[in-house]
Each structure stands twice: as structure tokens, then as C-alpha cells.
Amino acid sequence: MKNFIVRTITGVIFVAAIVASFIRPEAMVLLFSIITGLTIWEFTGLVNERENVTVNRFISTVAGVYFFFAMTYFCSDLYGGSAKSVVFIPYLVTIIYLLVAELYLKQADPIQDWAYTMLAQMYIALPFSLLNVLAFTATNNGVVTFNTLLPLSIFVFLWVNDSGAYCVGSLLGKHKLFPRISPGKSWEGSVGGGVFVLAAAYAISYFMDDRMLTMPQWMGLGLVVVIFGTWGDLIESLFKRTLGVKDSGNILPGHGGMLDRFDSSLLAIPAAVIYLYTLSLF
């Protein structure tokens, strides 16, 4: 009972913080830069527990956070001046340093160090940074505006999917979705979660009156988030099983670590960006 209360309180605070951050662009940038840093720090700490793996946690974390801020600057004009691609040069220099440094560190398995270093950037820093692509959109006259709904909807769809899948799976779940990796997930739960997300997408389109996306486009976005969010969850489960850990961390009481809370979004965010970009081509 105590664990349930702790888990509930943590969950409420977590959701409230995410939702509130999208009220102001500065709050969104601050919160998700912190989330990016904490998640990379957690990830690199986990992989460093493996034999012959020594990833530079500090520089990898700083690089990921810098990349998030660079994407913010590139996608917006909130901090003065036009977006300049030169902002990415320090990030590229840092990545080159992390690669070249292995020549002189004489580690037992530098290939693993390189692989995990780059994975931290591609798997964590890049997806979180792509939130800026969703949050900052240009109008027809070239003015950049802060879009609250698009990035927030990704998380709403993920939360609805998790809740719907849990409820339906608990009641009707009989056929395992991926027993080798996540025995608790069922096909019935996954389909049920998807149905709940479609209902949420329909509700958003109803109240938005096609001002941003049409009803079919909202529902398409919901399906993309469900499918890739589920894969993201399974990928993190495989990662933990490979490392032999139950939770990625304990920073969130009752919920585990940062990767445990954001695993679905790490695949859903890039997939949503690709989906919306594809819509813009037609």
C-alpha cells in the first residue's frame, strides 16, 4: 500500500511537471535539458557496469545537453538572432574528441566505449532534442511560434496508451506480445491501449476544429505513437535484460529511473517528427 501511494504521488508530480513545462517555452527547454542530462548520466552509468566498458559520463552528458540547447537555438528565435547551423560545431568537436580520446586511454575494449558513447547521443540526446522541432513551428510569414499541443500530445498519447494497455491487459490479456523480452505485455492490452489513444486523438481533433491537423491525421499520429512507443518500451526492456537489471535507476520513487519513464518517448518522438514531416510533403 505504501509503495502504491509513493508511486501515485510520484506519477502525479511527474505528469504535472511535464504538462506545466509546455505552458512556457523557457520551462520546456529547462525541464527537458535536465531530463536529457539525467537520462544520459543514468545510461552511461549502467553501461559502465559492464566489463571492459568505460564511457566518459561527464563529457557524454554535457554533449547531450549541449545538443538539446543547440537544437533549441536552431529551431527558434527566442534567444535572439537567426538560427545558425554553426551552433552545432562545438558538439561535433566534442564527439570527435570522445572518439579520438580512445586512442590514448588504452582501454581494454575501445569499440564498446565508442558504441555506447554514440548510442547515448543517438538513443537519448537526439530524440529529446527533436522535441524542439515539434515545439517551435514557423508560420507562413516566417515567424516562429511556440506550439504547446504537438509535443504535449505525444506524451498524452503515451500516457493514455500505458493506462489503457494496463487496464485492458489486466482484464483480458491472454496472448503474450513479446514473452522473451516483456512477459507482462499482451496483444489484448496493446490493442486496447491503441483504441484508447484513437479516442483521445478524436477528442483532440474535435476540440481543435482541424486548425492544426485533420481528424484522420491526429488519429494517424496517435497510431504512430502507440506503435513506436511500444517498440521503445520493448527496446529498453531488452537493454535492461541484457544488463541484468530490473530498473534503470531509482531517481523516481516507485517508478524506477529516467529510462524507465521515458523509454517509449525515445522512439515515439522521432517517429512523430517523421510522420508530421511526411504529412507536410503532401
Which residues does each PLM region occupy?
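Interfacial loop-to-transmembrane junctions
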Residues: 242-264
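Alpha-helical transmembrane segments that form the membrane-embedded catalytic/substrate-binding core
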Residues: 10, 165-166, 185-197, 229-232, ...
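Transmembrane alpha-helical segments of integral membrane proteins
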Residues: 100, 231-247
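Juxtamembrane boundary at the C-terminal end of a transmembrane helix
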Residues: 274-282
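Short, conserved aromatic-histidine micro-motifs
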Residues: 213-218, 255-256, 262, 281-282
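Membrane-embedded alpha-helical bundles of polytopic integral membrane proteins
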Residues: 1-224
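Re-entrant/interfacial helical elements at transmembrane boundaries that shape
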Residues: 169-171, 240-243, 266, 271
